[in-house]
């Protein structure tokens, strides 16, 4: 169960990084 939670957090982290790149660095 813990592994799936960590994997989900990693996926959210990747989405968050893409959002930051889009908003701040204008890389969409």
Curated annotation (Swiss-Prot):
Pfam families the record matches: Antimicrobial_2
InterPro entries per UniProt: Antimicrobial_frog_2 (IPR012521)
Record bears the keyword Disulfide bond: yes
Location in or out of the cell: Secreted
Described purpose of this protein according to its UniProt entry: Antimicrobial activity against Gram-negative bacterium E.coli.
Family (UniProt): Belongs to the frog skin active peptide (FSAP) family. Brevinin subfamily.
Protein name: Palustrin-1b
Species name: Lithobates palustris (Pickerel frog)
